[in-house]
Each structure stands twice: as C-alpha cells, then as structure tokens.
Amino acid sequence: MLGGISIWQLLIVLGIVILIFGTKKLRNLGSDLGGAVKGFKSAVGEEEQKKQDGEETAQHRVAHDTNEEPLDTSSKATQSSGADEKSERK
C-alpha cells in the first residue's frame, strides 16, 4: 500500500495523535491551517489582480499615445511673445 504502511497502522497513529493532542487542539490546528491557506490564496489573487491592472494601464497608455495628435507649439510661442510685447508697452 503506502510504502509498507497498512490502513491499520495509520488508524493506530491517528488514535495516538488524538489521545495526545485532543480533538479541540486538532480542530484549532485545522482551522488555523485553513485560514493560512485562505490568506495565501487571497494574497496571490491580489498580486495577480495588480499585475493585470498594470498591464491594462500600460495597454491603455500605448493606445492613448498612438491616438494622440502632435501638439502645435507655434501658437503658444506667438501668444507668449504677444504677452511680452504688452508688458513692454506699459
């Protein structure tokens, strides 16, 4: 069976463990272990979600950058030079 261990030997070991620790401690141990596994799964899920959000943001930036028209800086230069002329007149 399991490397030479029979079902009866496993039941005897389980009985001894229950006698030593008691069912309450084993129940607490099981719930603690279950809570740890649940916490681990949620942490992994959060990391996956952050990774997916980062990829979506990067894809959105790339799509936004490629759809953007080039800025016309010549109109800004004329507006600022006109403002300089007005301040010099005063």
Swiss-Prot record:
InterPro entries documented for this protein: TatA/B/E, TatA/E
Topology class, membrane: Single-pass membrane protein
Main subcellular location: membrane
Compartments in which it is found: Cell inner membrane
Compositional bias (Polar residues): 72-82
Biased composition regions of type Basic and acidic residues, renumbered to the chain: 47-67
GO biological process: protein transport by the Tat complex
Region (Disordered), start-end ranges: 42-90
GO cellular component, one term: TAT protein transport complex
The keyword Nuclease is annotated on this UniProt entry: no
MF terms (GO), sorted A to Z: protein transmembrane transporter activity
TM regions (residue ranges): 1-21
Gene3D superfamilies listed in its UniProt record: 1.20.5.3310
Sorted UniProt keywords: Cell inner membrane, Cell membrane, Membrane, Protein transport, Translocation, Transmembrane, Transmembrane helix, Transport
Pfam families from the UniProt entry: TatA_B_E
Name this protein carries in UniProt: Sec-independent protein translocase protein TatA
Organism expressing this protein natively: Chromohalobacter salexigens (strain ATCC BAA-138 / DSM 3043 / CIP 106854 / NCIMB 13768 / 1H11)
Lineage: Bacteria, Pseudomonadati, Pseudomonadota, Gammaproteobacteria, Oceanospirillales
Gene name as annotated: tatA
